Amino acid sequence: MLIVGPAWPLRAGGMATFNERMAYSLQEQGHEVEIITFSMQYPGWLFPGKTQLSDEPAPEGLNIRVLLHALNPINWLITARYVQQYRADYLILRYWMPFMAPCLGMLSFWSTILGSKAIRIALADNIIPHESFPLSRVLTKFFLAQTDSAATLSDSVRADLMALGYRKPSIRLKHPLYDNFGAPVDRETACNTLGLDPGFTYFLYFGFIRAYKGLDLLLEAFADERLRSQNVKLIVAGEFYESPDRYNRIIHERNLAPHLVLLTRFIRNDEVRFLFSAAQLVTQTYHHATQSGVTQIGFHYHTPMLVTDVGGLAELVDHDRSGYVCPPNPEKIADHMIDFLMNKRYAEMSAQVAVKKQEFSWEEFVRKLLSSGSPT
């Protein structure tokens, strides 16, 4: 079995983590698995972060082949030859943006032409990109034409798939838990490890900072005067993938600096469990979204979540039980933060998260993923 997508040594955040965790799960079920990752994923002018390479050790027990060049058609043919020679039963193609459509589509096309019998499954994070551009739909259609079936991680993305006219087998799967960052630790230990005062309540923004993820909404909400009487701080943990200027302007104009913990850099895997164990509420105030792996980290650590009612985010959180679902509006977001603090909702919501998380197993995910591409 071959998985094509970001993995170590790329520093690709949640997508690399997902692919590696999926490979482990497939191995646990007796499959021989190899991940083909990129030797070059993005040209420098397109990559907004500081570096594309991880300084963390390779994940143990995984076969990862650094082979695919996103912009080199000759390399696509070489990689397709490798796929054919590997004789995989399944070729899982991770798709998240139209920029990757020529590379992944031609790899799939050539591997079949060269004689590969692998069932080609598109595992699509997005069909309509967060930042659309001319030809994006054409490119996505081209990629999808080179697949035998498709799986999505939210109803909204599957609806986009259908809207593009995809008529091959498709399935909506539940995004499994990110349970590979280590076990939860007690809150005081987590705070002490991070150098935080455990006397405060902490809310958490986690992940790359991009316009669609709505950190601006969150900062505006956190400036609500009602929150100043509460002993609460917001942790912003993630690397800027755009200019920080507008966020810094909000922080300055709203005098938010004393109420923030800014960890605006790439977050290492060994830091994740401490951040989610220290936080009592994960805040995902997106302007628009498909789904987010951050939610699945929150589930693993039994941390309640506040999400905006956009895309697939609301599909996972039961409003007023495991968290809150609200409009992408600073005042409404602040209303729910106040409710969480004033009514001491953490314990009851955390208990509901612990129950809900049972729905998101990796074993069930990979079983359904493979069956989606099998002949009926």
Regions found by a protein language model. Name each.
Residues 145-185:
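Donor nucleotide-sugar binding/catalytic pocket of nucleotide-sugar-dependent glycosyltransferases
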Residues 245-270:
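Nucleotide-activated donor-binding/catalytic signature segment of Leloir-type glycosyltransferases, i.e.
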Residues 196-213, 219-222, 235:
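Conserved donor-binding/catalytic core segment of Leloir-type glycosyltransferases
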Residues 5-12, 24-86, 162, 170, ...:
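N-terminal strand-loop element at the rim of the active site
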Residues 319-331, 338-344:
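Conserved acidic donor-binding segment of nucleotide-sugar-dependent glycosyltransferases
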Residues 345-359:
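A short, well-ordered alpha-helix in the C-terminal region of glycosyltransferases
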Residues 182-196:
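A short helix/loop element that forms part of the nucleotide-sugar donor recognition site in Leloir-type
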Residues 274-290, 303:
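Acidic donor-binding loop of glycosyltransferase active sites
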